[in-house]
């Protein structure tokens, strides 16, 4: 008779051990050493000692939770948010902003094997100009409105949020009261808030038709609060109830966008990021510049104010059309937008026949591994790579370095203070 055996699972004892943290990773976890390997402990800071319980024991690392903290680091802060520790939005409100930035910069420097000399940051509070709040109305219970718990689909009822733009934070109680008064509360999915240059937007997702009375109540609310209201009965449909088409400012230009289009959450960092990209590229009046993954023109249009000509390339047709409209709206006639599959060889396109002096790219988290060889063929003098994923940035950078480019500037973008998100910007120059 055959017998089957399963591999023994590594058993973690609930033994309490005392450790001292010597580092902070980019996600805000304290890092100690135990039994010759890294031990990650959420909630602890460098120079803090604690009694901890091992919760996961792997071959290369382990995880633990704090049983009792024995001392406090001078870098420890009192979290401003009453929901901190339960809400999944922020992970580092207990960490001084200086330590947050140092730990993120150190993680970036290790990955890129290059010193981080620039930190681009804005105010650490009230910076989020966009947020999505989940909605749920269980039978015979009040409406829930808030963010998801860490590692859970449960909703944390948010009464206040100190990282939201003040205009949005002030609206939360009134939005909750308005939505709770509707007859169709059980059909509400989520509400998105955006603080645009044109004013405040509210986008309400609902899963069944709203009654005429509910629509009228929402419209009255939008007028009384002076906000633009959009209803989203289906994922691809957007119904304008009140207000004007939104826009935001990028380097002194006005960019129109659809309420569901991606815009950078942190306005102050976005403005500095665009300005720094123009500075690093050293855009001159005779330059031809290529902007890959250009969206609706956040970088493209400011580049066009300085260069002889700019080409923006994007994989989403609606954003290409929006970019063209924004160029016309801002009186820029030296910029063209194209919809292309960026995995294909862009150097074979007619618009690339004269080459480019400078290239900027701002890809999604997956990076731009399929694009790097095409950029190399263009032989630009300078390349600025804006990244929201340091791992794919490090991978893509190798291709440029192997082709004779050198990292000459590296910046950490503190786009999301109090979270583990790490964004960055690199200047490569051809040697």
Curated annotation (Swiss-Prot):
For the ligand (S-adenosyl-L-methionine), the binding residues are 264, 293, 298, 314, 341, 362
Give the GO biological process terms.
rRNA base methylation
List the active site.
Answer: 388 (nucleophile)
For this protein, the record's CDD domains field holds:
AdoMet_MTases
Q: What Pfam families does the record point to?
A: TRAM, tRNA_U5-meth_tr
Binding residue positions for [4Fe-4S] cluster: 81, 87, 90, 161
User: Mind listing the GO molecular function terms for this protein?
Assistant: 4 iron, 4 sulfur cluster binding; iron ion binding; RNA binding; rRNA (uridine-C5-)-methyltransferase activity
Catalysed reaction per UniProt?
A: uridine(1939) in 23S rRNA + S-adenosyl-L-methionine = 5-methyluridine(1939) in 23S rRNA + S-adenosyl-L-homocysteine + H(+)
Q: Would you tell me the protein name for this molecule?
A: 23S rRNA (uracil(1939)-C(5))-methyltransferase RlmD
